[in-house]
Amino acid sequence: MQWTVIFENESLKHDFNRLSRRQKILLFSAYLYRQVRLIKEFDSLYSEDLSTFFTEVLGFVVLEDKEKLRNIVEVIDGRIPDTDEFSEQEGSYAQNLIIALRYLVCFLLRIDESALQKCVDMSLQNIDLINYDVDENYDEAEVVAREAKIIAVFIERAIRYAQNKVCDIDTVKNIVGSDWV
């Protein structure tokens, strides 16, 4: 699964293209945060405390705290789990999610739309892996449709919550609602 399958879909493309920068940051922060369970499972298996780091960095992203994020890309690079060392499936999930976080930070710092696409692609790899683990012959079209519906809901929520004066990690949790992975 990739960005184009979901975001080039006519039902989402128009709404997505109208989003402000702040709304996009909220949207993609929530889209990543909905997978936080995967990093928590990684932590429980490997005791790396990566979920705290993930949540902290995501909090800086939502606050658009460029000062704190300036040098964080290198720190993120150092925290990406190596699947040779962390060989269980949780290592792959955590690796994909931390790389997705890195791309989200790069988008914020450089306003690079391609970084958003890479962020989503890494996140979708986890969705693909999860579904493959459940059923090797899963219906990708069905999963894509489900992810598109979630994105549509997140777009609506991001638009609504972006009107708040201050957005933080709790705002992201509100956007996720009950749509956890």
Question: Language-model features: where?
Answer:
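Glycine-rich, aromatic-bearing surface loops/beta-hairpins
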Residues: 117-181
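Structured binding/interaction patches within domain cores
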Residues: 3-5, 10, 21-146
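N-terminal secretion-targeting helices of virulence/extracellular proteins
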Residues: 14-17
